Amino acid sequence: MGNCCSFLFNNSDDIDEQTPLLNNDGIQRTPPSAEADMSLRKREEEEEWESKVYDVAKNKFIDVFSLRLRTEAPQRDPRDNIYEEVLDQIDSLNLDPKYDVAKPTEQETEFIIRKLGVLIDDINNIKLSDKEIKGKMVINLSKVQPNITGSPS
């Protein structure tokens, strides 16, 4: 290992090899300031809290949209099962033509009307969030014509 400035001081590389690095025995290290100590403690507390959150999150549900930890399973709306119920009802229908029964029973009619009403309400209540695209330009790329002439004038 040579000293890059040895030619300026007329020192040879041998001197650099023989000179050990200075030790820190006589230098007293200053303890961390109270502010640095508090920030270190805060970071340790944050890391501990994060590890607890991750541990709890393994067994709990996380609301990914708000990124808040849920402490219990989300409550399901009873209307959430309507699609499965309708499919079960459709699967259980006997589609063989029966000439003696032309209309569904009153109970079946009420059930179908109620479920279709809930389905229509759900469709009408769907609102798209524009938070993701607010302030961004949305372009249909199939309608964009390339500019062959170069830079716009």
Swiss-Prot record:
Renumbered residue ranges of the record's region Disordered: 16-40
GO cellular component: fungal-type vacuole membrane; Ragulator complex
Record's signal peptide: none
A biological process from GO: regulation of TORC1 signaling
Residue ranges with Polar residues bias: 20-31
The protein, known as: Uncharacterized protein C29A10.17
